[in-house]
Amino acid sequence: MNESSHRITPMLEQYLSIKSNYPDTLLFYRMGDFYELFFEDAETAARELQIALTARNPRAENPVPMCGVPWHAADSYIHQLIQKGYKVALCEQTEDFRESKGLVQRKVTRVFTSATTTEETSLDPKTHTYLGAMYWDEEVNIGAFCWADVSTGLWTGIQVKKKSELWQWIQKILPKELLFPEKYELPATAKLIEIQFVPLPYKTHFEYPQAVKRLLQAQGVADLEALGLEKHTILVQACGALVAYLEQTQLQDVNHLMPFKPLDIGKYVILDEITEKNLELFKRVNGKKGVGTLIHVLDHTLTPMGGRLLEERLHHPWRDITTILENQSVLEWLILYKENMKKLQDALKAIYDLERLSTRIVLNRTSPKDLLALKNTLLILPRVKDALIVEINVKDNRYITIDESILSTMPTILRQLLTKWDNISDYAEKLDKALDENPPNSIVEGGLFKLGFNAELDELMDLLEHGESKLQALLEKEQKVNNLPRLKIGFNRVFGYYFELTKSAGTPPSHFVRRQTLANAERYTTEELKDLEERLLSATEKRNTLEYKLFQKLREELVSIRPRILFMASLIAQLDLWQSLADVAIRHNWNKPTLLTNNNIFIREGRHPVIESIIGKSVFVPNDLVMDETRRMLLITGPNMAGKSTVLRQTAIICLLAHMGSFVPATEAQIGICDRIFSRVGASDNLARGQSTFMVEMMETARILRQATSRSLVILDEIGRGTSTFDGLALAWAVAEDLVCKDHDGVRTLFATHYHELTALEEKLTGVHTMTIAIRHWNDELVFLYRLIPGPADRSYGIEVARLAGVPQSVIQRAKIILTQLEQTHQQPRSLLNLLPGVVQNANEELSKQDVKVVEHPVVTLLKEMNPETLTPLDALKSLVEWKLLYGTTHAT
């Protein structure tokens, strides 16, 4: 819309001037008790928020579109807009309109975006909300990606050497917003990722010298070595851009960010975004959260910090056996001391979100209720510790402090945690003495502090509460001292408080000063009345001013102890995660796995935790599984619906849980440490990217073949679909061969397939073992037993599965007839072993050693030797008969 066509008032001039600095935002412009929006912003906000669109000067030739929301309800409207991908700039009045001599001064105090919000109402308490920044240097072919949860201050990042790996991490973390240099060309598929991409100028955001300066200032350190970034130039540039963007949106220093630590990938089992999706760790395949996901089964956390730590641990399971065993030992201890765990759970339920509370305190966005929540949490801290160091005497229900000998039975990691415990009792007591139990919604409303916290504030509060009685007391005093029983006290807006004396009521004393003469009375004031009036009329404003001053002083003190608060938040999160995993183990009868340094996997009566939680333990059929150096690849055959995919997924999930330090859904499990877990399971077209099911499958398979090592675990389901039978079979064969022979030791692989020809690999390659899912026929019905047994399936049972799926009986009967005819009239394909010249240990090496020769059919050879010019019709006929016989003989072998 062209603003020049409208009559621009001084107020609108101010609006447009401010708006010009924030062109990509919706400007919430404070006017009294409302935030107003004008021009295109008003039209957009009215449409998105479903509020009335009006006009300023509606009778003008070109009225200015406008809409508004009440200031006290602005948070909910802003939340709606940022959830829809908009940015909102909040423009406040910076001076009191009563003191302003002209136009009230205003300025933007904050910019809201989807990744930078800190308001509790806009955040999922148990999920991180990340802001990301990426940078790729074409000259050195190195890229970096960093991500920060602005609401907690947690941030980290990585530096990589492949663009594909960079985008794998971006899709795994999935930040709400991703910052990138505006001249960088995003891949064509980027627009399909659920991320807001924010282009930024290179010079002002990513340039190295500025990035270093900005990063060091934000972190309060002298050099990059303090952050472990001295060798991560590209990562520094990404971090610098992230800090710059935060400064632009928060409009203040961003010193609330925790000390930066690059993510040490070597410490963790790597799960790419495809594996997380296929295993349904956080979302179901349809994209929905909740029931049907692994985190839904695991999440018995009782605090927001614990919930977010569970999310982190599921993203990044450990590789270090010592760390895993330490965490297992705590779960064992909690399961053994169930009463103590119950006390711990009761205490944790009262804990608020210390990380996000402390961030709002630092950013000066805290509310009185935030302070009350902090106080209540600090007062609970002793109970949390006592839950673990106090023994319950069941007989008489007494609590006894555990002596040193019993304390020594605690796992070392738990005992060390308790020795570092800080109740922050000094500030718990201070807040308890200071804060009223029923605080106002906003600090400007007053009533935050208790009586007795501050003498001056007490006096003001006493005035406000007892003002009428003080006026009455002064009246009674004057009546008595001056013998004026008919003296009255009153108030009006012009003269304020006054004494009123009728002409017949008596003579006014000398200290009475006349204020107003009426027909039958006089109104007076006194020094004492004026003093009381001044104190009464200014008490509310003075109280609010003093409370705000005391509030800010208290807030600054809390900022100084934020490291202590965050440290305790991390301990509480760890305790909460431990109790959650212990609780899951008790509820679902999970057992402690043994971690191995070799590549073996042994699972007895393993179960899929998500499916079991839905259908019930009594219904779910558990399975055993063994992988060792003679069984590096398990080729699993069987019909659809028999349970092949379930076995694959549950094996990967059991391995993942073991690396989290969790117990696992199995009677017994021995798990060799993994460096990566890969999952290529299920079919999915990506039509928006122009990728068929087959293309998606091959891309995922290619990633596995390039990145898997002998320490990895790979689960593959139905490689080679979506193309011709022989193409698919050849690809599946080659993939299996590559995985079995990789790095000489092979990759631990579970390979489910319908290509029964692949079972021949068991005879030729060491490490391949065939398995199938047991089925039975009962009264011409196919019964799935869901039990994994040795050997290949005898056939595919496709028609039987189709009947179970509800395909009409007429179609089923016709399919059976056609199948019988095909089996009778078509020669069976030769064994794949006979088709192939031999199984090669390394296809690439084999091809490099020899030329690939095409063996001609004998008929083709004879045809080439024939000379048509000398051939008689009779000879030609004889040749045709001979060739036909020869063709039939060769095709019968």
Swiss-Prot record:
Q: Which GO cellular component terms, listed alphabetically, does the Swiss-Prot or TrEMBL entry include?
A: cytosol
Molecular function (Gene Ontology), one example: mismatched DNA binding
What keywords appear on the UniProt entry? ATP-binding, DNA damage, DNA repair, DNA-binding, Nucleotide-binding
Residues annotated as binding ATP: G638, P639, N640, M641, A642, G643, K644, S645
Q: Does the keyword Hydrolase apply?
A: no
- UniProt-listed Pfam families: MutS_I, MutS_II, MutS_III, MutS_IV, MutS_V
Q: Would I find Cell membrane among this entry's keywords? A: no
According to its UniProt entry, the protein's GO biological process terms are:
mismatch repair
Q: Which InterPro entries match?
A: DNA_mismatch_repair_MutS (IPR005748), DNA_mismatch_repair_MutS-lik_N (IPR007695), DNA_mismatch_repair_MutS/MSH (IPR017261), DNA_mismatch_repair_MutS_C (IPR000432), DNA_mismatch_repair_MutS_clamp (IPR007861), DNA_mismatch_repair_MutS_core (IPR007696), DNA_mismatch_repair_MutS_N (IPR016151), DNA_mismatch_repair_MutS_sf (IPR036187)
Superkingdom of this protein's organism? Bacteria
Q: Identify its protein family.
A: Belongs to the DNA mismatch repair MutS family.
Read off the PANTHER family from this record. DNA MISMATCH REPAIR PROTEIN MSH1, MITOCHONDRIAL, DNA MISMATCH REPAIR PROTEIN MUTS FAMILY MEMBER
Task: Describe its function.
Answer: This protein is involved in the repair of mismatches in DNA. It is possible that it carries out the mismatch recognition step. This protein has a weak ATPase activity.
Q: What is this protein called?
A: DNA mismatch repair protein MutS
Which species?
Answer: Lawsonia intracellularis (strain PHE/MN1-00)
Question: What would be the name of the gene that encodes this protein?
Answer: mutS
